[in-house]
């Protein structure tokens, strides 16, 4: 009887890869080699997109702040500059949330920004 050297080890490794590839289309979820190659590509996309997510959200927050500021006759850059002069230290995530959910509070921030610029 021949000696089995990698039987259980290989099976476990393949099962782990195929488990991670669940939900992929066609042979990419059934065959080890295709699944492994697809997972390598998926890992590069994951790595890249974890970094891109930070940029995307910052861009979204800036758009929301700009839209809220323009409703009150001011653009984004002058609004942020006025907040800095007024020593109001709120990050863009919080400002975007206030602009979307609490228009009265955002109007008060716009007024404070406008007063600090004059």
Curated annotation (Swiss-Prot):
Species in which this protein is naturally found: Deinococcus radiodurans (strain ATCC 13939 / DSM 20539 / JCM 16871 / CCUG 27074 / LMG 4051 / NBRC 15346 / NCIMB 9279 / VKM B-1422 / R1)
Q: What does this protein do?
A: Binds directly to 23S rRNA, probably serving to organize its structure.
Q: What is this protein called?
A: Large ribosomal subunit protein bL20
Keyword Flavoprotein found: no
- Please give the superkingdom of this protein's source: Bacteria
A GO cellular component annotation in the UniProt record: cytosolic large ribosomal subunit
Q: Which family is annotated?
A: Belongs to the bacterial ribosomal protein bL20 family.
Share what the entry says about its subunit structure, partners included: Part of the 50S ribosomal subunit. Contacts proteins L13 and L21.
Q: Does the keyword Disulfide bond apply?
A: no
Name any one GO molecular function: rRNA binding
Q: Which Pfam families match?
A: Ribosomal_L20
């Amino acid at each position: 009887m021949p000696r089995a050297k990698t039987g259980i080890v290989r099976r476990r490794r393949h099962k782990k890869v195929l488990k991670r590839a669940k939900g992929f289309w066609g042979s990419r979820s059934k065959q080890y080699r295709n699944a492994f190659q697809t997972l390598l590509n998926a890992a590069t996309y994951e790595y890249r997109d974890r970094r891109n997510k930070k940029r995307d959200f910052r861009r979204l927050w800036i758009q929301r702040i700009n839209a809220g500021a323009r409703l009150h006759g001011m653009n984004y850059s002058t609004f942020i500059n006025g907040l800095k002069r007024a020593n109001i230290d709120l990050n863009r995530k919080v400002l975007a949330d206030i602009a979307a959910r609490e228009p009265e509070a955002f109007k008060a921030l716009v007024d404070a920004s406008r007063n600090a610029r004059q």
